[in-house]
Amino acid sequence: MSSGTSGDQISHFGKTLTTTASLVFGSQSMEDTILSYSSPYKKILHDTITSSGGTSSLMKVERSGRMFTPFRTRNSAFQDIFHASSGRGYFKNGFSDTRTSFQVLSYLSDAMLADIPSSESAAATSGKLVTEKGEKGKKKRAETAHARGPSLYQGFEASLPTINQTITTHQKKQIMNRDIKSIRESDATPEDVGQDVDIEKGEEETTHDEFTLPKGIKPEHLSNSYSIKNLKGAVQTITDNLDLLEIQKNLAASEIRELDLKMEKLKLMRDLVFRRVAKIEQNELFLEKHLMNIRERIDMIEEYNLDNDTDAEKAYEEATSAPEDTKDQYSELPDANTAESGETVVQEPQVNLASAQKSLKKRSKQTGYSHKNHEKKVQQHEFRHLRKTYPTLQQYYEPGANILSFDSAHEDNVTCLDFNLPFGTLCSAGKLDPTIKVWNLSKNKHVASITGHLATVSCMQMDQYNTLITGGRDALLKMWDIQKAIDNDSIPSDEVCIYTFDSHIDEITALSFEANNLVSGSQDRTIRQWDLNNGKCVQTLDINFATGGNLSRSMIGSGFLNTNNDHPIIGAIQCYDAALATGTKDGIVRLWDLRSGRVVRTLEGHSDAVTSLQFDSLNLVTGSLDNSIRIWDLRTGTLADTFSYEHPVTCLQFDLNKIVVANQEGTVKVYNRQEKKHWFCGGDEHSENAVEYVRYKDGYLVEGRANGDINAWAI
């Protein structure tokens, strides 16, 4: 038998001893234990401590100041296991004689001795190693207490079947391994090996499932026997086996409780580490934000040639070395401020900054576009690959767990939302409300509100550097620097707005931006491409063919005042470099080349309006009012997969692992692309509070509902 199997048996035997002993002693009241007031054990222990049974005592050791030094020299403790050279030496100590030590260490109560089944049980019961009147007076109660729990012997006996079964199973596995090895060395086929394994597996399952009567008892003998003695013997044997099974059950229950305690401790440890990771990631976000601010300031200083390290150092040296009466020349400048970190901050000359600000404003008025803000956008794109950290805390939530909720974030249904990164910044908009609300996802609070649109905001996109572009029913596109609103919630909205694009003449229904390109779709049946370098429209694509016919000028002009829920002509747009994908009301997905402004491929299959789409390097996923999701292979232009829901699809996003869908139901639908399985998260599937909009990034999902609630989930 292997050492691992022997270790398991010893461990199981130890648990058996512990559990049985706890049942024996736990079944008796405190007054009935061997440590009761009149117990001989207590008397012997008292004699040992007070030196009644020996030449020295624990009390004398304590008074003399001698210390117990384990493993260094010969111990003067009551029990010295490590220096006992023989059985007699085991009972020798410095506190009592050998006889007293033997009585203390070998004492067994009458209740324990009475439990040993033997033909001489009566003699064992009457003969005691130590007797005292108090012990005899409690014999009856001890026997009554014994009826409530098993003995040590019974516990040992109960462990034998488990040990025997372990030995038998191990021997069978050894035989099977030898047989398989011999078969592999021979010319046997794989089918023969599989049959042998199946036979062994079947025999093992049969062994576990079969239940038999105790040894020596057969069902046919019981049914044909007329001997009361034999039948009573069978009753006693079966009763004893039931007692053993009860002990085995208690052992198993004890193991379950032990595992539960370990799992609870592991859960507590996991929660502590989880909170530690959350705190670390918040610190990372804090440092990343300041790192970006420093980079922006460096760019501004380089652009306007404001570098004055030499002048600043010279001014600092003069300020620190000049006499007190000569420091009046700096009275017009603020004193050196002490930062929270304890470092001294030297104020920059105000003249250069003021002239730079005037120059910046003048340049902005001349070009009609804030060059500084545009440079910020370009720099942000270049710094995408320089980001040092990225949040991963959402990966450690249980799938489908609610991370946070903003109840009644908007008075009406949420029309659109987007966030920069998990636990970062979220922007959202509601129906019939032109206000954009900004939320901190790590602190779970509202941090700013931005105004500027004249009507409902119908679409938006946000990058990971807090640049937001929105489109509304007022036919306007606006670019925002959300970081300004976060840093100062009282700042005027016109300072948060970087630029306004105003060439459309009807509601903006879809937009997408990437690098220096912005593409927008409108109810005026045009798609416009914008250059973010100068804010100008560089191309207009006409899509009148999407639905046939033309809209009247009056209908176009009054579009942003219309509050009906007609589905948009252009339902979804995404651009990447020179590639553009559009989904329109006719159910057709068109792939465009922005360099030529022409359609290079059409994907037909939806029977109703396309409301959402997204593509990567391999696939294009589209959602439609026909309740279906279609996955297209961009390499061949063919349909790779499709599935449907009970209600129309209004919004979707995907990555390599999952597709998340909003379809006017009370939950977010999730499709696992690897396992081909569907599941949902977020409340009641049949709730009237339907999910209107979803955004999903790296396992972090945010959804907006018809009642204005916003929730974040880990998937």
Curated annotation (Swiss-Prot):
Name the domain of life this protein comes from. Eukaryota
Choose any GO biological process term that the UniProt entry carries and state it.
mitochondrial fission
Region (Disordered), start-end ranges: 122-147, 313-380
What InterPro entries does its record include?
A: G-protein_beta_WD-40_rep, WD40/YVTN_repeat-like_dom_sf, WD40_repeat_CS, WD40_repeat_dom_sf, WD40_rpt
**CDD domains hit by this protein:** Mdv1_N, WD40
Q: Where is the signal peptide?
A: none
Sorted alphabetically, the Gene Ontology cellular component annotations on this record are: mitochondrial outer membrane; mitochondrion; transferase complex
What GO molecular-function term can you cite, just one?
ubiquitin binding
* Stored SMART domains: WD40 (SM00320)
Q: Where is the composition biased (Basic residues)?
A: 359-375
Classify the protein's membrane topology as the record does.
Answer: Peripheral membrane protein
User: Which residue pairs form cystines in this protein?
Assistant: none
User: Which keywords does the record carry?
Assistant: Coiled coil, Membrane, Mitochondrion, Mitochondrion outer membrane, Repeat, WD repeat
Polar residues composition bias: which ranges?
A: 347-358
Q: Where in the cell is it found?
A: Mitochondrion outer membrane
WD repeat boundaries? 409-449, 452-490, 503-542, 564-604, 605-644, 646-681, 685-715
Cross-referenced Gene3D superfamilies:
6.10.280.220, YVTN repeat-like/Quinoprotein amine dehydrogenase
Query: What SUPFAM superfamilies does this protein map onto?
Result: WD40 repeat-like
Name the coiled-coil region(s). Answer: 228-268
Q: Which family does it belong to?
A: Belongs to the WD repeat MDV1/CAF4 family.
Q: What does this protein do?
A: Involved in mitochondrial fission. Acts as an adapter protein required to form mitochondrial fission complexes. Formation of these complexes is required to promote constriction and fission of the mitochondrial compartment at a late step in mitochondrial division.
Q: What is this protein called?
A: Mitochondrial division protein 1
* Species the sequence originates in: Eremothecium gossypii (strain ATCC 10895 / CBS 109.51 / FGSC 9923 / NRRL Y-1056) (Yeast)
